[in-house]
Amino acid sequence: MTRAELFAQIQQKSSFLCVGLDPDLDKLPAHLHSEPDPIFSFCQQIIEETADFAVAYKPNTAFFEAHGAKGWETLAKVEALIPKHIFSIADAKRGDIGNTATRYAEAFFTHMNFDSITVAPYMGKDSVTPFLEFEGKWAILLALTSNPGSLDFQLLQDASGKALYQTVLEKSQEWGSPENLMYVVGATRGELIGEVRKQVPEHFFLVPGVGAQGGSLADVARFGMNSSCGLLVNSSRGIIYASKEKDFAKVARREAQKLQEEMRELLDRYLH
């Protein structure tokens, strides 16, 4: 998917919502456990009910990989369910180099046809560029994440006072472009989102941490939006686990619509 196609979806739906698919078997509604593939049934109903409001879906591959070969089959089936005009993200956080990275890219881009994959850039250029060699595909680099442990490394400063995440942003812009490179920027870092935007004015951000983790959607839009929106704000638990009853998918739809309505207002206010 191209940047222009992604922005067209945002404009059409007045939304920059990414629905995270984290199907924890222990948290699924009880009635689904009698299904041949409970995880697939869960994701299928979530996608069907939220597709009107979502511009992206982000399956967390760990929740599929944990079930071995069957889990991989389920992941492939879920990816195939995502409408082709909606951006798909393999949240796999791969981070190896060379031929290994190329094989990861083939797995997610060629065999499962995801539009993008999350990548850990700790090993440097060698761990990122293999993903950028696939036309129409994206690498989404972990830059400034929302978890408490991000303080261990990402905000460490060098002798000049530059934080490690800033070095990641600076160097990685040499490897890709706003057409194939995004960054993970956590919503709980609201005070720093504006600084990240100044450093990478054109790139899209994938923003976790809104809702259950305490991040502010309004702050994300205020400090992070650019002329192409430039934001994919992820919500997982707040949507997919809003109900554990048989109405879970309908409740998920309502929660997705609530976020979309907030996003419509923010797009009207800040898109320029």
Where on the chain are the PLM-derived regions?
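Conserved N-terminal beta1-alpha1 strand-loop-helix module at the mouth
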Residues: 1-87, 247-248, 253-264, 268-271
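Short amphipathic alpha-helices and their capping/turn segments at secondary-structure boundaries
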Residues: 1-13, 46-48, 125-134, 218-225
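Short, well-ordered coil/turn segments that N-cap beta-strands
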Residues: 13-17, 52-55, 84-86, 115, ...
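Conserved, mostly hydrophobic/aromatic
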Residues: 19, 57, 91, 117, ...
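Active-site beta-loop-alpha junctions enriched in small/polar residues
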Residues: 20-26, 62-64, 93-97, 122, ...
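Conserved anion-binding
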Residues: 25, 96-184, 202
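Active-site-adjacent beta->alpha loops and helix N-cap segments on the catalytic face
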Residues: 66-81, 97-101, 122-136, 188-198, ...
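A C-terminal functional module that forms or caps the active site or interfaces directly
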Residues: 187-234, 238-239
